[in-house]
């Protein structure tokens, strides 16, 4: 899992201030960090089906948040995508 220091770093990088944990950009960045962690975990533990299900759930959650963010603020969406390196 992502530890507390990594979460604080993500929040300070993508949030408006240090305590801005609820904005869409921060939520997407945190979910992306969890997805990266679970992807590495599943490379080692191929038969961990519950983690795979959790990963798919997170991917769907991130997809819906990205769709919302794209409709709400296109410029911020494009900046977030480039910072996270999600789409090529």
Curated annotation (Swiss-Prot):
Gene3D superfamilies: 6.10.250.3130, S15/NS1, RNA-binding. GO terms for molecular function: rRNA binding; structural constituent of ribosome. Keywords: Ribonucleoprotein, Ribosomal protein, RNA-binding, rRNA-binding. SMART domains: Ribosomal_S15 (SM01387). It comes from the Bacteria. InterPro entries: Ribosomal_uS15, Ribosomal_uS15_bac-type, uS15_NS1_RNA-bd_sf. One of its GO terms (biological process) is translation. It holds the Pfam family Ribosomal_S15. GO terms for cellular component: cytosolic small ribosomal subunit. PANTHER family: RIBOSOMAL PROTEIN S15, BACTERIAL AND ORGANELLAR, SMALL RIBOSOMAL SUBUNIT PROTEIN US15M. Belongs to the universal ribosomal protein uS15 family. HAMAP family: Ribosomal_uS15_B. Part of the 30S ribosomal subunit. Forms a bridge to the 50S subunit in the 70S ribosome, contacting the 23S rRNA. One of the primary rRNA binding proteins, it binds directly to 16S rRNA where it helps nucleate assembly of the platform of the 30S subunit by binding and bridging several RNA helices of the 16S rRNA. Forms an intersubunit bridge (bridge B4) with the 23S rRNA of the 50S subunit in the ribosome. This is Small ribosomal subunit protein uS15. The lineage of its organism: Bacteria, Pseudomonadati, Spirochaetota, Spirochaetia, Spirochaetales.
């Amino acid at each position: 899992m992502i530890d507390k220091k990594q979460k604080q770093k993500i929040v300070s990088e993508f949030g408006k201030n240090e305590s801005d944990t609820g904005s869409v950009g921060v939520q997407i960045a945190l979910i992306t960090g969890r997805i990266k962690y679970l992807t590495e975990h599943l490379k080692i533990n191929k038969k961990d089906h519950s983690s795979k299900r959790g990963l798919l759930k997170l991917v769907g959650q991130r997809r819906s948040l990205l769709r919302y963010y794209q409709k709400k603020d296109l410029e911020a969406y494009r900046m977030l995508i480039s910072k996270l390196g999600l789409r090529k």
